[in-house]
C-alpha cells in the first residue's frame, strides 16, 4: 500500500507518501499560499522521494478542511483528478484531526491531556476541536480521541467549553496548535489559568501532509475509502458572499448581471 496525501488548507502546501511500514516521504513549500502553482511539483517530489512512480500509488488522500476555502478546493480537486486518472480510491481526512495528530508527540511530552487545534476564521471566529491525547493499551501507540465537536466556535466560546471540561480533571494541561494561536494568543493567555496551557512551536503549528498521510493509512487499512466523486470539501461555513446571498444582503449589482 502506498498512499499519497495532499495538504493545502493552510499557509503552506505539502504532499506526502506513506507506505505499509509507516515510512513517510514528504515535500513542502516555504511560500505562503502558493498551492495552485506548486502542488503538482510537490507531489512529484514526494513520489520521487518514496522511490516509486505515480502508477504505484494505491490511494489518494486529501485534507478536506476546514481552512482556506481556496486551498481546500485546490486540494480536493487535485485529489479527485489523480484518483480518477490512476483508478484508485480517495480518502478524506479532517484537517483538525490531522493537526491534532501532528502535535501529539509534543503534547504528550508536555504532559498535556488535551490537544486543541485552532484555525483562525477571523473576527474572533475559529474552526476548532478538542482531542484527548492517549496511549493505546499496549502503551506503544498514541491516539488523538475527539472529546469536543469539530465546528466553528467563537474563541471565547471554545475556551469556556474547554475550561469547563478541564475543571473536571484537576491539573490538566491543554496543548494549543494552529494559526489560531497567532491571532488569539492574548485571549487564550488571559482566559486560561497559568500553567494550564502550552502553545505549539511555529515549526509544528501549521498543517502538514505527513499527519494527513498517517491518518489516511489507518483509514485505508480500515476500508474507509471513497470514489473520486464522493470526496467532498468540509468548509464548516459558507463563504462570506454565500452567507450574504442567503441572508439577502448581497448587493443587487453583484447578484444580478448588469444589462449593457
Predicted regions and their residues:
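N-terminal beta-alpha supersecondary unit
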Residues: 1-64, 206, 260
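Phosphate-handling active-site elements
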Residues: 49-56, 83-93, 108-111
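Acyltransferase
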Residues: 198-260
Amino acid at each position: 500500500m502506498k498512499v499519497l496525501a495532499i495538504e493545502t488548507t493552510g499557509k503552506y502546501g505539502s504532499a506526502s507518501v506513506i507506505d505499509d511500514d509507516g515510512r513517510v516521504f514528504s515535500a513542502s513549500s516555504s511560500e505562503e499560499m502558493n498551492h495552485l502553482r506548486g502542488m503538482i511539483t510537490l507531489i512529484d517530489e514526494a513520489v520521487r522521494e518514496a522511490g516509486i512512480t505515480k502508477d504505484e500509488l494505491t490511494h489518494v488522500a486529501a485534507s478536506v478542511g476546514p481552512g482556506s476555502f481556496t486551498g481546500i478546493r485546490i486540494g480536493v480537486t487535485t485529489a479527485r483528478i489523480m484518483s480518477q486518472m490512476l483508478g484508485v480510491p480517495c480518502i478524506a481526512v479532517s484537517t483538525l484531526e490531522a493537526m491534532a495528530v501532528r502535535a501529539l508527540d509534543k503534547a504528550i511530552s508536555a504532559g498535556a491531556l488535551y490537544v486543541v487545534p485552532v484555525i483562525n476564521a477571523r473576527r474572533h471566529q475559529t474552526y476548532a476541536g478538542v482531542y484527548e491525547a492517549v496511549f493505546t493499551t499496549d502503551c506503544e501507540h498514541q491516539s488523538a480521541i475527539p472529546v469536543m465537536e469539530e465546528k466553528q466556535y467563537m474563541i471565547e466560546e471554545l475556551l469556556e467549553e474547554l475550561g469547563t471540561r478541564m475543571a473536571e480533571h484537576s491539573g490538566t494541561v491543554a496543548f494549543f496548535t494552529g494559526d489560531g494561536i497567532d491571532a488569539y494568543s492574548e485571549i487564550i493567555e488571559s482566559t486560561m489559568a497559568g500553567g494550564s496551557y502550552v502553545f505549539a512551536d511555529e515549526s509544528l503549528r501549521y498543517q502538514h501532509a505527513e499527519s494527513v498521510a498517517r491518518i489516511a493509512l489507518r483509514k485505508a487499512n480500515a476500508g474507509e475509502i471513497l470514489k473520486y466523486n464522493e470526496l467532498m470539501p468540509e468548509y464548516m461555513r459558507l463563504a462570506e458572499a454565500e452567507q450574504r446571498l442567503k441572508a439577502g444582503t448581497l448587493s443587487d449589482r453583484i447578484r444580478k448581471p448588469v444589462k449593457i
